[in-house]
Regions:
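Ferredoxin-reductase
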Residues: 1-82, 139
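Reductase modules of NAD(P)H-dependent flavoproteins
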Residues: 131, 135, 140-228
Length: 228
């Protein structure tokens, strides 16, 4: 399948939000899933997976990506301009809201925020009787991707609690500090009837899972997706 780049914008240091128009495909995916972009680069066909950051609907989908200057794929992606086409496959993935939907804690670092943005935009309105808490951790304030969108969702939906945290905060920062693991345990308190969704770098996800196991959370309530 093919998609045409419609527009893009910078959302962080070396991080870009891309909006594509699919050609001959309706964006039929479940929030939380990902697409695989493919491109022939030199003698190799390179494939990279990116979580869909937009809700389903129409023939458009959005992705966010970091530029890795010495990488093989991201420099090509960042060279795309509106009107350029790219091949993709999918959607794939089982990192989606479980049924029946329970109160949920979502834990993200970096571009791990992508599937949660899709889930929240698409599902908050459908589940007003369920509480959703998002704990989003980055080093610097500028790394809080989609911060404005998430603040608006927290304002518009009483059942959504947005908790950003910085590990290297400026003196002017008045919000939470430290790693997401501690804030997740704080949000969970003594409850064990909550689903915990975790997305981010492998080290964080593995550590978060270990801590949840230590406090006795049923492994079936731990839903995770990790990347290197």
């Amino acid at each position: 399948m093919k998609a045409r780049l419609a527009t893009y914008r910078e959302i962080g240091l070396n991080t870009r939000h891309f909006e594509f128009e699919a050609i001959g495909w309706t964006a039929a995916f479940v929030p939380g899933q990902f697409l695989s972009l493919t491109q022939q680069i030199g003698e190799d066909e390179i494939t990279r997976a990116y979580s869909i950051v937009s809700p389903p609907g129409g023939n458009r989908f959005a992705l966010c990506a970091n530029l890795v200057p010495d990488g093989r794929f991201s420099p090509f992606l960042f060279d795309l301009r509106p009107g350029d086409e790219i091949a993709f496959k999918g959607p794939y993935g089982a990192f989606i809201l479980r049924r029946p939907v329970s109160d949920s804690i979502m834990v993200a670092t970096g571009t791990g925020i992508a599937p949660f943005r899709s889930m929240l935009i698409a599902r908050l309105r459908d589940h007003p009787d369920r509480q959703f808490t998002l704990i989003f951790g980055v080093r610097y304030e500028a790394g809080l991707l989609y911060h404005g969108d998430l603040l608006r969702l927290a304002r518009d939906y009483p059942n959504f609690d947005y908790r950003p945290t910085l590990t290297r905060p400026p003196e002017t920062w008045i919000g939470r500090t430290g790693r997401v693991q501690a804030h997740t345990l704080e949000a969970l308190e003594d409850r064990r009837d909550v689903d915990v969704y975790v997305c981010g770098l492998r080290e964080m996800v593995d550590d978060m899972r270990a801590k949840l196991k230590e406090i006795g959370l049923d492994r079936k309530r731990m839903i995770y997706e990790k990347y290197d």
